[in-house]
């Protein structure tokens, strides 16, 4: 198989994630977060010409990368849409059952590293954070047009910030004179109302604010919930869903979505032998290894989880 130019991008948990799919060479798989194709290429290496791989990504740059590097693979199909619409899109290919889904949640490294995309709190750019460059809502609209109450809500809910009020007050004060246009402009505003002690911590003080804005702009948690629910329903017997998550909110969505298929609604004291259609596959390590951390520090917060359908 031909090598793929990855532009030095290293996919998170590459071997662990693809190994966990337990790939059968003639089956159907879906990489729900194509990015720069690291996971997809590894999956394709394990498929025969009869096997099929469908990949999803909203990003225009990801589509260009696919066209330049993956169009040669006749059993690989790019779908430019949010993975929350996986069921509807796969139906267009007459696909109702899938043998494995891979989700690598959050923002991709190429998006973070491209200053023009406005995701990074370390690189100066216009506030954007859109995974889908064609949508209207961006970080600029959120920061400059949302009410005080709504900003407080998203920072508390999506950033898990205990008291975002001082920072929100500073945002409202600043934007009353001029729009907040760039990422570093926003970082400076956050800094003004962040205690020195927190500014000196290892994790960047603006990280959770940017996370909250990004989740709001891209409706990430609702997308995860719908996609996982549909993936569970479409999964073939012995098929697996592999998720790579990066923070507690993503992990909570995964746990809550799986809860209905893993927990019995029948009280324990009722003498009925419960059988479940799904089981969690225990993977070691759930966290990235030290060697992978040396190659890609962004794997530090990654968490791998695998669920398998055991009954139709």
UniProtKB/Swiss-Prot annotation:
Q: Which GO terms describe its cellular component?
A: cytoplasm
- Write down the Pfam families for this protein, in alphabetical order: Methyltransf_5
Q: What is its EC number?
A: 2.1.1.199
Which terms are listed as keywords in the entry? Cytoplasm, Methyltransferase, rRNA processing, S-adenosyl-L-methionine, Transferase
Query: Which residues does the annotation say bind S-adenosyl-L-methionine?
Result: 37-39, 57, 83, 104
Q: What Gene Ontology terms describe what this protein does at the molecular function level?
A: rRNA (cytosine-N4-)-methyltransferase activity
Top-level EC class: transferase
From the UniProt record, give one GO term of the biological process aspect: rRNA base methylation
SUPFAM superfamilies linked: Putative methyltransferase TM0872, insert domain (SSF81799), S-adenosyl-L-methionine-dependent methyltransferases (SSF53335)
- Kindly list the places in or outside the cell where this protein is found, as annotated in its UniProt entry: Cytoplasm
In terms of superkingdom, the source organism counts as Bacteria
General function of this protein: Specifically methylates the N4 position of cytidine in position 1402 (C1402) of 16S rRNA.
PANTHER family, alphabetized: 12S RRNA N4-METHYLCYTIDINE METHYLTRANSFERASE (PTHR11265:SF0), S-ADENOSYL-METHYLTRANSFERASE MRAW (PTHR11265)
Protein family (similarity comment)? Belongs to the methyltransferase superfamily. RsmH family.
Official protein name in the record: Ribosomal RNA small subunit methyltransferase H
The scientific name of the source species is Malacoplasma penetrans (strain HF-2)
Native organism taxonomy: Bacteria, Bacillati, Mycoplasmatota, Mycoplasmoidales, Mycoplasmoidaceae
